[in-house]
């Protein structure tokens, strides 16, 4: 992607200082999603590495990963798989617990969401420490998916999340980077 487009995408993301707590700068993609041109460019860029290849499913992490992942799945003519917080899916599920900054959480997926060997791309809006994305990768692998890559609009490289996924042999594609957390 050319530098002007990357700069335009970065400019389309609102930064909110001291949210949700002092010292944190929240990267709000709702402004990017609300700009039709920026949204289109972001989805096109997320799709680009996989155009012409076989991607069976795109998995999106609740909640912003649903928006981006659904659009990516549509463009790739792939199915979409939601990865949700525990208790939100109506059918038989498989779940995984993962660590948060203060405590733990659980996410789940329908047990029949992918077929063994399905090639899956994981999509979310942002990667920080990588704990949620790592849990999603492990959950997908647990039900037989081949996770071919993980894609994010935003990377906070100082927090090490992309490196954490690469250590699991998952290629990571991100569009823009922001310093700090």
Swiss-Prot record:
GO terms for biological process: adenine salvage; AMP salvage; purine ribonucleoside salvage. It comes from the Bacteria. It is found in: Cytoplasm. One of its GO terms (molecular function) is adenine phosphoribosyltransferase activity. It catalyses: AMP + diphosphate = 5-phospho-alpha-D-ribose 1-diphosphate + adenine. Homodimer. NCBIfam families: apt, PRK02304.1-3, PRK02304.1-5. This is Adenine phosphoribosyltransferase. It comes from Methylobacterium sp. (strain 4-46).
């Amino acid at each position: 992607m050319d530098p002007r487009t990357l700069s335009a995408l970065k400019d389309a993301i609102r930064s909110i200082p001291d949210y949700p707590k002092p010292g944190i700068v929240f990267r709000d993609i709702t402004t990017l999603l609300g700009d039709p041109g920026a949204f289109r460019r972001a989805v096109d860029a997320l799709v680009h590495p996989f155009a012409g290849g076989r991607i069976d499913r795109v998995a999106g992490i609740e909640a912003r990963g649903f928006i981006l992942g659904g659009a990516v799945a549509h463009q790739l003519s792939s199915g979409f798989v939601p990865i949700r917080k525990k208790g939100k899916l109506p059918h038989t599920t498989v779940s995984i617990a993962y660590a948060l900054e203060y405590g733990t959480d659980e996410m789940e997926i329908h047990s029949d969401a992918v077929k063994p060997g399905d090639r899956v791309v994981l999509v979310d809006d942002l990667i920080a420490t990588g704990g949620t994305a790592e849990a999603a990768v492990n959950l997908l692998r647990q039900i037989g998916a081949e996770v071919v890559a993980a894609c994010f609009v935003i990377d906070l490289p100082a927090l090490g999340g992309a490196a954490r996924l690469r250590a699991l042999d998952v290629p990571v594609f991100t569009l823009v980077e922001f310093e700090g957390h």
